[in-house]
């Protein structure tokens, strides 16, 4: 049996979303079909409103619905700290920690030559004028090969500008047992250890 063309189209469009394969798209399509029309209209309205109202902050490239994002607009933020992250979701994760009071710069990806992503496809160039001598730039890219390569590339660009470049620490999660840690995570936890007594 073949699916009706409108269902095929819906499955195809849903499968274009990140992390959604054909089977997940099919399940979502059937789920949406079962929902009341009002729920579907509300979802469609939310999608259209988000596309209409949201844009990137012209300073840090985080997502906002205002002229500048909340962080860039907040004068109480530490202007001597810029945390460079891969995606807008990373900003939310760091903000949730409650431990960071500086600014951000969102790259919208990582260097990935295999996928055709070079420096020109990321928001790297607009970061450079924001950097001042003595300012600390925290590189908070992921621990993937691409994340590490992006951090190294940025370090080489930023250090000649007089910036103090640091990388976020990696290691064991809170409550994690050593026996369950992989070798790379455990190695980084040991290398990035902190002194606790003088």
From Swiss-Prot:
Pfam family, one: RecR_ZnF
Domain of life: Bacteria
A GO molecular-function descriptor: zinc ion binding
Keywords carried by this UniProt record: DNA damage, DNA recombination, DNA repair, Metal-binding, Zinc, Zinc-finger
Role according to the record: May play a role in DNA repair. It seems to be involved in an RecBC-independent recombinational process of DNA repair. It may act with RecF and RecO.
Organismal lineage: Bacteria, Thermotogati, Deinococcota, Deinococci, Deinococcales
Domain annotation Toprim: ranges: 80-173
CDD domains in the cross-refs: TOPRIM_recR (cd01025)
Organism, as annotated: Deinococcus deserti (strain DSM 17065 / CIP 109153 / LMG 22923 / VCD115)
Protein name as catalogued: Recombination protein RecR
Zinc finger (C4-type): 57-72
Family indicated by similarity: Belongs to the RecR family.
């Amino acid at each position: 049996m073949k699916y009706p063309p409108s269902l095929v189209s819906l499955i195809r469009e849903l499968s274009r979303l990140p992390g959604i394969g054909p089977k997940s798209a099919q399940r979502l399509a059937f789920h949406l079909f079962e929902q009341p029309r009002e729920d579907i209209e509300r979802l469609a309205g939310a999608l259209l409103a988000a596309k209409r109202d949201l844009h990137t902050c012209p300073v840090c490239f985080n997502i906002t619905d205002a002229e500048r994002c909340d962080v860039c607009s907040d004068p109480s933020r530490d202007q001597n700290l810029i945390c460079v992250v891969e995606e807008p979701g990373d900003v939310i994760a760091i903000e949730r920690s409650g431990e960071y009071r500086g600014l951000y710069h969102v790259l919208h990806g990582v260097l990935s030559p295999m996928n055709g992503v070079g420096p020109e496809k990321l928001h790297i160039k607009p970061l450079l004028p924001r950097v001042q001598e003595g300012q600390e730039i925290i590189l908070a890219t992921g621990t993937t090969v691409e994340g590490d390569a992006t951090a190294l590339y940025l370090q080489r660009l930023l250090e000649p500008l007089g910036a103090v470049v640091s990388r976020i620490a990696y290691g064991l999660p809170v409550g994690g047992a050593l026996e369950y840690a992989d070798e790379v995570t455990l190695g980084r936890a040991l290398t990035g250890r902190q002194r606790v007594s003088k």
